Amino acid sequence: MLISPALIPSRPRRPATRLLAAVSLALGLPLAGAAQESVLAPTTVKGQALQSNRAAYSVPVLGREDIQQAAVSEVEALWRQVPGMHVNDYQLGGVANSVVLRGFSGGGHGGDIAATLDGISLNEAMSHADGYFDLNVVVPLELEEVAVHQGPVSVLQGNFNRAGLIELRTRRSGEYREVELQAGSHGTLDAQTALGLRIDDASQLFLAAQHARGDGARPDSGNERSTLSARWQHQLGGGLRIALSGRVHAARGDSPGYLSLAQWLAEPQGKDARVQGDGSQKHFKTLRLDINYDLGKDTHLLAYAYGTSQDFVRWFTRPKAGQWAQREERYARSVAGTGLNLSGTRRSAQWTLGLEALREATDYGYWDDLQDRRRSAPAINDRQATLNNVAAFAQLDWKLHPLFTPSLGLRHDRFTGNCTRLGAETGAEACTRMQRLAHTSPKLGVSSRVNEQLTLRASWSEGFALPGNFAKYALGAAQLDPNVFRQTEVGMQWRASRQLWLDLALYRMASSQEIRNLAPGVYENFGETLRKGAELQAVWTPASTWELRWNYGRAQSRVTQNANAALVGRHVAAVPRYSSTLQARWHMHPDWTLQGALRHVGRMAVDASNSVWSPAYHVADLGLQYRLPASLGLQDATLSLMVRNLADKSYASSMSVIAGERLVAPGAPRSLLLGLQFSL
């Protein structure tokens, strides 16, 4: 476990801009003992029983204080604080970016990383790419903690849990009324609020809302999104507790698209005139029920059920056959899931058993050669894909001795599904019933507390991936096995002194049985990749007024077996050789704090043949915080001024090669943000 020490013109309908104001009316509600911790027992969520048993694995954790200090508008802005984690920002309004972890480059925009919110998966089975997820449905201020399980070490997720698991947990206890406001360059506005209200002696209500908008630094790059979440929990007595929660999100964004390399060098924040009408819009809503029952003092049962409905559309212009063409992708997604968790403690052992079922259906439409969102040809794809997943998992953590604390986990997944054409298609991708696939993934770890200062850990874990996209619905994929990933890791956590704390991890992950396409509709398991790397987190407090944090990750991902011999030994594209974040905070006065950050990102291959490379870059931020006097009537009020990209560095936040043309997503220029945080 890695945790910082305590010392240290479709124009679609616009999201409702009055969303935040409606929730903020609750700020005037009287609270019994505001800012005091509630005596009500919070309801638990899936996997929470495993929260204290992470010592055998690398699991960086960002707590509520870390999240509030970061003052971010988007959850993904936190990843720079996690060693080895990086975001390749596509700068495409409303479209998920690509998250890099453990030598994988396809998290978020693809399926290399699993993501959960209060134990429920955020990954989308067939949206754009298998495992796509959008964290903008989460309000940063509502989070209690964020944990990043590095590698396929968690039993909580199966498919998509390759590079690791992002585990988000919202606040479910306490009484609070918090507000965070930001405004700055390029029309940026972000307003968030989080409320914890005690209704009576047996009930609590938790609300969070966010409205964010911006004009963007480039032409036609405006965006707007709104999110509202609510959770009501009630204690019935006799060890029985229930919780009902819901979430609504709406977003729209315009996109100036990519630039050619020559265009970027000439005008870094410009726009290609061939891009017209690019952008996206999304609507998301979900509802869930949690029932907790205490079977005994040390044994707890959780039952849950949830449903999600979502629609998403994007328009994207890119090179195609010597010209630039716009494509349209539409997704209408519905999800239903349920599960049981049984957990307990017996002497020195903690255990968890789980059973869950999920059904996800996605209506998918794809058109090409549009002109400013106007279709000119029939649909290439018009179909519905369903994916059903039934899984069972178990984990045992046994504190036999401080020098030997093993963790044993096992997860079994079974998948079925079907593909049905909804209308005429011009595409030739397969669309039949999916053959049943199953996989069992073991997880083994051990931690050893040598003394008060030093803890060692080692682990071996396995993850897997199903055939991608519509390959799983092809008759020629009937005999395929899942792509398997096996990780070995060793690590240490060392408190060298009261001023210095270190965590180091070394890992090796080999993938086998990769899936390749031999001919239309025909596939086989062939291909291997080896990923190796190191991750370091350090916290140094040389004086009571100074704090330095350094997160560093180095990754090497190479192809070791491929049908194309020219690719053997090549680096996996879009994985930086290293990433580093150095942060400093100086409390120069009881009410004044100066802070800065320096982010380095190493060079990375852009294409599979490694013929094109994206150069290394670095970006610096500088900020000043002032704690406002209590006489203003606000609690914990802080006024902040932040300059992002202090030197106005011109850099590529991502590069790609499409139809033989090198394209650039320009990084954000220098921007100024004024922020205010307070409680009532």
Task: Describe the function of each predicted region.
Residues 247, 396, 458, 488, ...:
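Conserved C-terminal beta-signal and adjacent last beta-strands/turns
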Residues 105, 252-254, 258-266, 361-373, ...:
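Surface-exposed extracellular loop regions of Gram-negative outer-membrane beta-barrel proteins
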Residues 35-68, 76, 117, 294, ...:
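Short, acidic, small-residue-rich periplasmic hinge/interaction motif at the N-terminus
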Residues 178, 185-213, 218-256, 278-300, ...:
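Transmembrane beta-barrel wall of Gram-negative outer-membrane proteins
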